[in-house]
Amino acid sequence: MTKVQQRPVRTAAPRDAQSLAALHARAFDHPWLVTAIADLLAGEGVIGLMAEDATGPLGFVLARVVAGEAEILTIAVDPSHRRSGLGGHLLAAASDLAARQGGEALFLEVSVDNQAALGLYDRAGFVRVGLRRGYYTGTNGRPVDALVLRRNLNKPA
């Protein structure tokens, strides 16, 4: 693992959907389809940011801003680059862009058993505001609860 906190982040486009879906499949047990990612990236109010190297994407975040609220739809980091700071870097970049697009608060759902993600969101200043019972399906097929987290966004100067 290489420290990648300062890796440049670029806007993701629908043409990136194939490689982002492949990364999502490496990062999650229930990956998103290429078409779902492409459709989101083509949508209005959607934020898509990615970090990459010569081999392809290392991480990405999809978010959207609607009526003053921003939501992280997914954030994925290649397993070989986890705990490198990349997730926090992508989250900060998406938060900044969401604030510039009028977002006053940022929301997300996270599995109660995803300790790495919970640590990331805690360090980023998110607080628990709700619980969605059975929101996810675990690897064993059983329902897994999701925490709903919120963080106020600082308005850009």
PLM segments and residue spans:
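Acetyl-CoA-dependent GNAT
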Residues: T2-R7, T11-S84, G88-Q101, G134, ...
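Conserved catalytic-core motifs of GNAT/GCN5-like acyltransferases
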Residues: F107-E109, V127-V144
